[in-house]
Amino acid sequence: MTRTRTVKKEKISVASEIDRVEERKLQCKNSLERAEFRKRKQQLSDDDRLALEDEMTILNERVEKYEKDLQVLRGENRRNMMLSVALLAISALFYYTFIY
């Protein structure tokens, strides 16, 4: 099962993976904002307040995790772009050296 999941994950482009992670991060931030708004505006019992704070802690951890994932993905995207530029430069060099 993990093999098929890995194969599917490899077929996804880095740019689409970045978009997906950014969307999830945005959803978590929106949920966090709603939770903070509820905490400020509503009179909550101690149990509800603790549950809300736990939820906010979990959401903050998820946002941090997504930010780390984005940082890694952007680095990978940057590396892929540099590799593409290098291949283009080498191709142009060979073209002008041997064909032109």
Swiss-Prot record:
Major localization class: membrane
GO cellular component, one term: membrane
Protein localization: Membrane
One Pfam match: CCDC-167
Topology with respect to the bilayer: Single-pass membrane protein
Chain segments annotated as coiled-coil in the UniProt record: 14-81
Annotated transmembrane regions: 82-99
UniProt keyword Plastid present: no
Sorted UniProt keywords: Coiled coil, Membrane, Transmembrane, Transmembrane helix
PANTHER family hit by this protein: COILED-COIL DOMAIN-CONTAINING PROTEIN 167
Record-given protein name: Coiled-coil domain-containing protein 167
Origin species: Danio rerio (Zebrafish)
